[in-house]
């Protein structure tokens, strides 16, 4: 028998995997680092490399302000669930560059420009082009 996965750990893990999947949809590879350095994911697009911190909440946008000292992008994941079942296609991912984190309000309307929707290719590709530009996000 395996050890149980506590709900907060399951929520965070789902968020990290959803970010990886959404990024991969648009040609960005992302994976957790081998050692826990405080960054949840390292993402690659062409020659550009970015570190991501992922904050995940169920049925709301995370208000957690605890962030590591070094990261490039804050990924906020809003998991939608009904009766304990997560709907990945209805869940939302927002990629906020570190330079905008302090000024960004954590509500869906204010974060719209940072959303990485699975079904709006033009918006998602433009966002990723900005975040992974040679000069950095």
Model-derived regions, located:
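Mixed-charge (Asp/Glu-Lys/Arg
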Residues: 1-37, 43-137
């Amino acid at each position: 028998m395996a050890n149980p996965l506590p709900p907060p750990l399951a929520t965070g893990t789902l968020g990290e995997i959803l970010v990886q999947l959404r990024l991969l949809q648009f040609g960005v590879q992302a994976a957790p680092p081998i050692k826990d350095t405080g960054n949840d994911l390292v993402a690659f697009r062409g020659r550009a490399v970015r570190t991501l911190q992922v904050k995940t909440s169920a049925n709301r946008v995370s208000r957690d302000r605890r962030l590591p000292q070094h990261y490039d992008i804050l990924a906020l994941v809003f998991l939608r669930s009904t009766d304990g079942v997560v709907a990945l296609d209805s869940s939302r991912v927002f990629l906020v560059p570190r330079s905008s984190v302090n000024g960004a309000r954590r509500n869906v309307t204010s974060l719209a420009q940072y959303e990485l929707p699975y079904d709006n290719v033009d918006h998602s590709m433009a966002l990723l082009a900005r975040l992974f530009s040679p000069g950095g996000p």
